[in-house]
Structures are given as C-alpha cells and as structure tokens.
C-alpha cells in the first residue's frame, strides 16, 4: 500500500490551534519589523529559567571585588604620591648641594650646613687631583724599571660567546654572554610581571592632576602667609607626607590654640599616670610590710617553742639568722689548711651489743654459711699445699691463724685449759715483744715509741678485773669472727706505710694520713 495515500488521523481542533499559533508568530514578526524600521529596539523578554547551581555566585562576591579594586586604587594613589614627594625632595637636595638657595633666610631654616658640604666636596676634589699628580710623578720616577705590557684579551672564536652588559628591571648593571641574553631578559620580564596602570580608574589627565596639586600648594602658602610669625612645627612642613609614623606619634593641630589644649590634655594624662603608679607602689610596700610582720610573728612563735623544748642554740640561731643575713658583712673565706706530713693514729674500740654476744654488722647478716664454706675450702687447700711452698713462719708470728691454725693454737700447751688467764696474757705479750724486736729494723722510730707507750700504758690495766673479763670472752669473739669471715680483733695492728706492728691492747689502730 502506498504511504502517500495513507490518510492522516488528525483532529480538527489541533489544526485550528496550529493555524492560531502561526498567525500569532506572523503578527509578532510584523511588529518587530515595523519597530526596527522606525529605529526603536524592543527589549528582549526576560527568561524565567531557574539558574543552575554552577552559575550561581556566593553572596557578597561582587561587593568584595569592588572593594578590592577601590583599595588597590587607593594604594596605587598613595604610592604615586610618595614617589612624587621623594622625587621633589631629591631635586631640592640636589639644588641645595649645588648652593642654589632662594634666599639667605631659607638657608638658616635647615639644620644641615650645605655651604660647608660644598667646601668639603671641593677640598676632596683637590685632594684627589693632588693624589693623581703624585701618582703620575711616581710613575715617571719608576720609568727605568721594566714594565711588562698587559696581554690583550683575544677575541672570541664564536660571536655568541662575547660578553655584553645589560640593565635589569631593577636598574642594576649586569654582564652575561650574548647567547644567554634573550633568555635572561625573558626571565626578567616574567619576574617583573605586569603592573596595573594606576590611572586606569580615573578620568583625570596628568595636566589636570598637576593643576590640582598646584592649587593646593597655593592655598597652603596663602594660609601660611596669613598666620602670624611664630615657631615652625613638624605638622607645618609635613605637607601630606605618605609615611606612617606609628602609634607613638601624636599629630598636633596646626592651630596654636588647639595645639596648646592638646598639650595640656597630654600633661594631665601624664600626671594621672604618675599618681596611679605611686599609689600602686605604696600599696605594694604596705603588703610587703604586713608580710614581714607576719613572718616575724611566726619566727617569734617558733623561737618560743624551741626554748620550751630546751633547744637554746637553735633558738638563738633562728633569732640571729635574719640580722646575720641582712646586716653582717661578707665574711672572708677561711684559709685552706696546708697538708701536713704527720701521721695521726685513731684508736677505735669495737663494742658488742651484749657482753659475750658477738657483734654482727648489718651487711654481714646471712653470710655465716657462705663464709663457713669459704673457710672450709681454705683449710682443704692448706692441707693439700706442699710445706716447701708455704709462706715463712715469720708472717704468722704473734697472729691468730685461720680455722686450722687457730685450733692448733688453742690446743697448744701455751693456751691449754690448764693455764689461767694471766698466763695466757703474758704469753701473748711475749709474742708481741718478739714480733716487735724482729721488725724493729723496718718500723720507724716514731711508731715504735708510740707502740711501746701503748703497751706500757695498757699493761697495768690488763691486771684489773674488767680486763680479765674481756680476756675470758676473747676466745668467744675470735671464734665468732672466724665464723663470720671477719678477722679477729684480738691481734691488733698499726699500719704505717709498708710495715705493721702487732699489738694486743684489745683495740684496732687505724692510721689517718693528712
């Protein structure tokens, strides 16, 4: 079936709507054409489409951008103003250094003596010329000496390797190779950046700006002429200076009456500050005095308590401590005593806790088993030792031997139970005398005299009843010391340099060398 002959199934209402829409568009086109021919441009119809989230800007962005532009313009304006002021000052300074003053009165206003500076500069130029002349004369005098000619620098083989001078963006003279010059200039331009035109936001030309500035200066000069003659202050000559002087600077008014009022206000504030400072210091002194009185009361209470307890020395020291710290002069350091060569002998007697009970030190408690095994081992070693390798018998004369030797001495006829205690003490004295005579050649005479005095002074004391009791307990103490691993205190020795002197005075003698 042919498609072209297929009937369209369209309602009559849709055809009417289509004709109406076509007629409306034709009428709008005719109106726009007539308005365009008449020179009237119709405004486009606003679209009611909702903006997307990507096209929507934050609130206040446009205002902040405008504010930044205004601030940038103000900064550029202040920069131009300060630059112009500096250029004017530089020109004025050049004129002054050359001596071009308008009149003599203005010359007296400046603190710098430019006339003297000109004279000094002329003197420096004259001295420079004189030095050059002296150098030339010296060169003429040294013509006889051989001077090697300077070697000329050969030209470069490659023209790109030639050294050239250029000026960078900061006005500095630089030198580089010719082949590197384009890259350096390009980098200099990138570092310099594009500067914004300061006059882009204003419609005033340079001539108009200069005219406004001239009018302002004329106005200021007229006001200065109307004022009576008087002192010149810093605000009078500042002339809208762009420099910021900080928070410590107070800009006084140029009017004299208002200036005096401002100065009076500042003086009043200064006096108030001084009064508050003095009041604060007085309050601090009162607090300090109250604290000192409280401390003195506490100190007196403590002194009273110490005196009640019977500590008079500490109480006096506490009372005099404050006076000594505040009023006493600095005492001289005590002289350091010189070392003497004398030998001081200190006699120390071992005291047991109870008579008949051996004294055990704190660090020796619990060591009985260990020292017992050690003494047993030593006894076995002595039994295994060859008598030929034993030490001489002189080493053990007048001394108690360890476990095996002490038992032999106790079983010997000299210390047999059949003898009395006075006989044992007499035998011990004989042994000590024999040892002293044997070592008389080695012991110094001072030590011999001291040992004789000790033996002579203690001999009658041994006959007393108290020493007899000590002699009766000597065997017990010796046995206890041998068990503890501590050497017996009965045979006493006086150690002096490399020799020893036995003594049976019942004391340990330890020498202290000063």
From Swiss-Prot:
Functional description taken from the UniProt entry: Probably involved in neuronal development.
Name of the protein in question: Coiled-coil domain-containing protein 174
UniProt feature, compositional bias: Polar residues: 405-418
Coiled coil: 66-98, 203-227, 266-321
Cell location: Nucleus
Name of the coding gene: CCDC174
Taxonomic source organism: Gallus gallus
Protein origin, superkingdom: Eukaryota
PANTHER family the record matches: COILED-COIL DOMAIN-CONTAINING PROTEIN 174 (PTHR15885:SF1)
Composition-biased stretches (Basic and acidic residues): 63-83, 335-354, 376-388, 420-429
One cellular component term from this protein's GO annotations in UniProt: nucleus
Record keywords, A-Z: Coiled coil, Nucleus
């Amino acid at each position: 079936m042919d498609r072209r002959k297929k009937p369209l199934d369209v309602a009559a209402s849709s055809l009417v709507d289509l004709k109406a829409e076509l007629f409306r568009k034709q009428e709008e086109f005719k109106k726009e054409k007539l308005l365009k021919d008449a020179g009237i441009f119709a405004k486009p119809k606003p679209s009611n489409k909702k903006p997307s989230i990507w096209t929507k800007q934050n609130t206040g962005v446009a205002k902040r951008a405008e504010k930044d532009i205004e601030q940038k313009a103000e900064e550029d304006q202040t920069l131009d103003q300060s630059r112009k002021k500096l250029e004017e000052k530089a020109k004025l300074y050049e004129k002054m250094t050359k001596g071009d003053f308008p009149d003599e009165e203005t010359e007296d206003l400046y603190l710098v003596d430019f006339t003297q500076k000109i004279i000094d500069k002329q003197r420096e130029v004259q001295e420079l010329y004189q030095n050059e002349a002296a150098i030339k004369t010296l060169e003429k005098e040294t013509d006889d000496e051989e001077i090697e000619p300077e070697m000329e620098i050969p030209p470069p083989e490659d023209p790109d390797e030639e050294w050239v001078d250029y000026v960078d963006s900061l006005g500095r003279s630089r030198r580089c190779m010719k082949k590197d010059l384009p890259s350096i200039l390009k980098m200099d331009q990138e570092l310099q950046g594009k500067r914004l035109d300061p006059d882009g936001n204003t419609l005033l030309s340079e001539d108009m700006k200069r005219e406004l500035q001239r009018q302002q200066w004329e106005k200021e000069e007229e006001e200065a002429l109307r004022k009576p003659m008087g002192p010149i202050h810093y605000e009078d000559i500042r002339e809208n200076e762009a420099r910021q002087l900080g928070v410590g600077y107070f800009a006084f008014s140029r009017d004299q009456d208002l200036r005096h009022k401002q100065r009076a206000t500042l003086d009043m504030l200064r006096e108030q500050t001084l009064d508050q400072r003095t009041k604060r210091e007085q309050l601090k002194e009162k607090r300090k005095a109250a604290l000192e009185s409280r401390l003195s009361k506490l100190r007196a209470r403590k002194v009273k308590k110490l005196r009640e307890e019977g500590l008079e020395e500490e109480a006096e020291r506490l009372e005099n401590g404050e006076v000594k710290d505040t009023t006493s002069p600095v005492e001289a350091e005590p002289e350091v005593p010189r070392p003497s060569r004398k030998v001081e002998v200190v006699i120390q007697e071992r005291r047991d806790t109870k008579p008949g009970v051996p004294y055990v030190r704190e660090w020796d408690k619990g060591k009985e088993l260990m020292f017992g095994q050690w003494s047993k081992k030593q006894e076995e070693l002595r039994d295994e030792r060859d008598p030929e390798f034993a030490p001489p018998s002189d080493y053990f004369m007048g001394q108690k031997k360890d476990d095996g030797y002490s038992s032999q001495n106790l079983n010997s006829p000299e210390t047999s139970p059949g003898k009395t205690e006075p006989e044992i003490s007499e035998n011990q004295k004989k042994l000590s005398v024999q040892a002293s005579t044997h070592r008389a050649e080695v012991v110094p005479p001072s030590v011999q005299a001291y040992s004789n005095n000790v033996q002579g002074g203690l001999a009658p004391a041994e006959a007393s009843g108290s020493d007899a009791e000590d002699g009766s307990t000597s065997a017990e103490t010796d046995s206890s010391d041998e068990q503890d691993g501590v050497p017996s205190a009965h045979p006493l020795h006086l150690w002096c340099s490399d020799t020893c002197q036995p003594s049976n005075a019942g004391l340990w003698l330890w020498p202290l060398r000063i």
